[in-house]
C-alpha cells in the first residue's frame, strides 16, 4: 500500500490528525475547514484503499490494526511528538483504537458523529434503518432482485466484488448513495448526477466498506469502550 498524506496550516503549529469516515471514504479540501490554519499543523491521510492511496479499493492487508500502524508510522515520519486526533463516524472508532494502543502520543481526542462498530450498530445500519428511511432502504433492496434484509450484505458484497464491472459499478453506486443519504436527517442530496460519478472511486469506496462490515470492522466495539477507560485523563470532546 502507498498511503497519501497531506500537510497544511502552520508548520510550527499544534499537530492535529484528521481521520476520515467510511470505512472507504477519503479526504479532501473541505476537511481542512475544521481547523484554524494559523494555529494547527493539519495532517490528513487517505486510509488504505481510499482516495489517493494506492491501490484504490485494495482490501488485502487492510484491517483496523493495519490502519493504526499506518497512523503511528505517519507520526514517526513527520517527527511529531504528540498530536490531537480528530475522527468522525468510522474515524471515531479508528481514533479510539489508535489512542488505546498509543496513548502516550495523544494529547486529546475530538470525536464527532460517533460510530463504534458494535454489532448492534452494524445491525441497525443494515436492517433497522428503514424505520427512519423506508424509501431509501426499499430502493437499496429493490436494486438487486430477491434481496431482503437477511441477505442484503451478502448480495451487495457478491455484486460489488464480481468480475462483471457494469454490475459492480451500479451496485457500488446504489450502496454508496444509500449510505451517504442516511448519514443526515436532511433531504437526500441530488447533487450526484450520473455524469458526475467516478465509477472507480465509487467501486473502491463500496469494496472497502463492505470488506470492513463483513469483518465487523476488525474490532470489538464493546472492547474498545472498555479499554477506552485508560484515556480517562485525556481531554476528549464529543460532538
Stretch-by-stretch model annotation:
Residues 2-55:
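Conserved HGGG/HGGXW glycine-rich cap/lid loop of the alpha/beta-hydrolase fold
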Residues 55-68, 120-129:
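Catalytic nucleophile-loop/oxyanion-hole region of alpha/beta-hydrolase
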Residues 65-84:
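Conserved acidic catalytic loop of the alpha/beta-hydrolase fold
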Residues 85-87, 112, 239:
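Short beta-strand immediately N-terminal to the catalytic nucleophile in serine-hydrolase-like folds
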Residues 92-103, 109:
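Short glycine-enriched nucleophile-adjacent loop
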Residues 104-156:
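A catalytic-pocket lid/entrance helix-loop region that shapes and gates access to the active site
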Residues 211-228:
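Active-site nucleophile elbow and catalytic-triad environment of alpha/beta-hydrolase enzymes
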Residues 231-232, 237-239:
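Short beta-strand/loop motif that positions the catalytic acidic residue
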